[in-house]
């Protein structure tokens, strides 16, 4: 009788557990052996959602349960240490991932999430700002003995930072019906002027305001008050 009771209890618990509704199918060309980990941050603590040990195959499949679109982390370990990791926007359904072992982050490609498509566009533009910034730094070194030239470069650097900030603001407002908007604003604009955060938050649709990143953005802007 007791045995039947515990068996019934296990069945009930299993039936109440959320079913996996997100699947990441991946292929890391060149990988022969290693561990691939799917993780996310919960209240600042990284939690492993799923993992798989690979030995002789570069392909894998990882699964978890999502309540809404959110940023996940894919990590690769070899010889017991973390070697590479990349963040991406996961959504309910199937996401396909491809990359090269030697250029894990640089050649990564995610398909299946509309939020990730927008994040890819955002990162492409952000990388252009980073390249411009590096070019200015190289020029600063080149003209380190020319104060007049350095003053000009410094002004251009300030303008570059402003252009980058306004790009992020406009991107957030233009994508106000996507979780990407409060995520980007909360990550890159938390130290900016309060009025910009208010403008972005007020532009969000109700669904996005109630999302994980909408709630976080609200907390960030209220903390600044």
Give the label of every model feature segment:
Residues 12-15:
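C-terminal motif of bacterial Sec signal peptides marking the signal peptidase cleavage site
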Residues 1-4:
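Positively charged n-region of N-terminal signal peptides that target proteins for export
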Residues 17-102:
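Start-of-domain marker
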Residues 66-71, 77-211:
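Preference for long, solvent-exposed alpha-helical segments and helix-linker "stalks"
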Residues 190, 214-225:
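TPR/TPR-like alpha-solenoid helical repeat scaffolds
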Residues 6-8:
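Sec-dependent N-terminal signal peptides
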């Amino acid at each position: 009788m007791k045995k039947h009771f515990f068996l019934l209890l296990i069945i009930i618990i299993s039936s109440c557990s959320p079913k996996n509704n997100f699947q990441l199918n991946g292929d890391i060309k060149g990988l022969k052996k290693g561990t691939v980990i799917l993780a996310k941050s919960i209240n600042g603590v990284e939690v492993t959602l799923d993992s798989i040990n690979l030995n002789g195959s570069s392909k894998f499949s990882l699964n978890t349960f999502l309540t809404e679109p959110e940023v996940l982390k894919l990590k690769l370990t070899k010889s017991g240490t973390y070697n590479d990791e990349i963040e991406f926007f996961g959504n309910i359904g199937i996401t396909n991932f491809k990359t090269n072992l030697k250029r894990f982050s640089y050649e990564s490609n995610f398909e299946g999430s509309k939020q990730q498509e927008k994040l890819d566009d955002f990162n492409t533009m952000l990388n252009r700002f980073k390249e411009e910034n590096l070019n200015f730094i190289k020029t600063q070194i080149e003209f380190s003995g020319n104060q007049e030239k350095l003053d000009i470069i410094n002004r251009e650097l300030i303008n570059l930072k402003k252009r980058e900030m306004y790009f992020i603001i406009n991107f957030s407002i233009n994508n106000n019906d996507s979780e990407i908007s409060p995520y980007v604003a909360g990550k890159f604009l938390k130290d900016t002027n309060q009025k910009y955060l208010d403008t972005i938050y007020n532009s969000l649709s109700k669904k996005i305001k109630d999302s994980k990143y909408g709630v976080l953005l609200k907390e960030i802007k209220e903390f600044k008050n």
